Amino acid sequence: MIIRTADALGIDGIILSGSCDLYSPKVIRSTMGSIFRTNILIENDTEKLFSMLSENKVTTSAAVIDKDAFDVTKCAFEGLQAIFIGNEGNGLPKDIAERCDRRIIIPMHGSINSLNAAMAAGILMWELKK
């Protein structure tokens, strides 16, 4: 779902780390061909990833559930951007969030305090493209 949404919104690429098998038949089917039109990098080495992003002057944001994080709807996304999204069970690891340039949150109403990863990714990618 994330890959398909990225393709639909014209996101430049996706970086995966420690995720499911990208080339499993189920994943390929669910992307409806987007897997073949989207730039995808698999990088499990955090040091290497942050070094690469820094060298390319990419601003990094950590999607977190934290009242002190910046409201994503009020963020200015200028230049190259990378948003880190954690998994649904544990969220983004603390060490990754702390290395990012800023922490962002999707504002939610009522008693809802989190979304599944695909839904959060879709909202965040939409905000990037505004």
Task: Give short role names for the model-derived ranges.
Residues 39, 44, 56, 87-90, ...:
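Detector for Asparagine
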Residues 8-9, 19, 27-35, 94-130:
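Structured adenosyl-cofactor binding patch, chiefly the S-adenosyl-L-methionine
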Residues 61-112:
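Active-site/ligand-binding-proximal alpha/beta "capping" segment
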Residues 55-57, 77-85, 123-130:
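Short flexible/disordered coil segments
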Residues 1-70:
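RNA substrate-binding interface of SAM-dependent RNA methyltransferases
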